[in-house]
Design a protein with these regions (language model features):
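Anion-binding alpha/beta catalytic cores of soluble intermediary-metabolism enzymes, centered on
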Residues: 1-217, 221-282
């Protein structure tokens, strides 16, 4: 089995070293590569010496994102003047009632795009769906169990203060609704709905009451926020109030997988990001 090579520009950091040690014991397909600095790490990915990069325990998010943008590059499938890149978080928490023993949510964008317009929000939605689909496939392990397959099917809720028009007229509501319609037109296979309040998105009882005909209400596992302000607040709330473990930010839209660690990351946080990177590359 060929191993996935992840480069770490902060290779000598003790947190990184301990996370690598644990990850090597857990994941047989993982190989760590060191680099002197952020530029050299990105160059290693660009040259194919490494499959992906994890950085940020010492570097700022701005440094990681801009260096990756300039060296690794951003995909531009729609030939935009400024192609979109974004970031998602993978949230997990033990839940014995679920088919995989844990609750899982993917949140985008909570780290990169401050005030997305409709085109950017459309790209963020598709990029986050791609991340979710790859991660859920990794968790699925090609199972034929119907309950497991249903649980690990991406279902996108476009979050808002309003549910399907209940908030009246508002620019952000109109923007979100336009994105939902565009995704449905261009990717009819994707399960998506919105705009939608968080409780309607993830609580089956409330979802049935507020959006009875929705394909995702009450069972959403991919949450798209309208801007970075609300996204970062939700990300911190899920960690601090909800006791979820967050892996990320997982940068999206780049020519190779890149993850930006929080400078407050624990060793186990870093291990979670390593696992997420392995899932996205597998």
């Amino acid at each position: 089995m060929s191993k996935t090579r992840i480069v770490f520009p902060e290779f000598t950091n003790p947190y990184i070293q301990e996370a690598i040690r644990i990850a090597k014991e857990k994941f047989s397909d993982f190989e760590a590569v060191g680099a002197d600095n952020l530029e050299h790490a990105c160059a290693a990915v660009k040259a194919g010496v490494a499959d992906s990069m994890i950085a940020g325990i010492d570097y700022t998010s701005r440094e990681v994102i801009l260096t990756a943008r300039d060296i690794i590059g951003v995909k531009n499938p729609r030939n935009l003047e400024k192609p979109t890149f974004s970031a998602s978080f993978i949230f997990t928490k033990e839940n014995q009632a679920s088919p995989i023993g844990q609750s899982v949510f993917i949140l985008g964008d909570a780290a990169a795009c401050k005030h997305p317009n409709s085109e950017q929000l459309y790209d963020i939605t598709l990029q986050t769906h791609e991340t979710a689909a790859k991660y859920f496939k990794y968790l699925n392990h090609e199972s034929t169990d119907s309950a497991l397959n249903n649980f690990l099917t991406p279902r996108i809720a476009m979050l808002s203060f309003s549910t399907l028009g209940s908030g009246g007229r508002d620019e952000t509501i109109s923007l979100t609704q336009a994105v939902v319609e565009k995704v449905r037109e261009t990717h009819p296979e994707i399960l998506i709905d919105g705009e939608m309040q968080l409780d309607a998105a993830i609580n089956p009882r409330i979802g049935e009451k507020k959006a009875p005909n929705s394909p995702v209400a009450g069972h959403a596992n991919v949450l798209i926020v309208p801007d970075l302000n609300s996204g970062n607040i939700l990300y911190k709330a899920m960690e601090q109030f909800g006791n979820f473990t967050a892996a990320g930010p997982i940068l999206q839209g780049f020519n190779a997988p890149v993850s930006d660690l929080s400078r407050g990351s624990t060793v186990l946080d870093i291990v979670s990001v390593i696992e997420a990177e392995l899932a996205l590359i597998s």
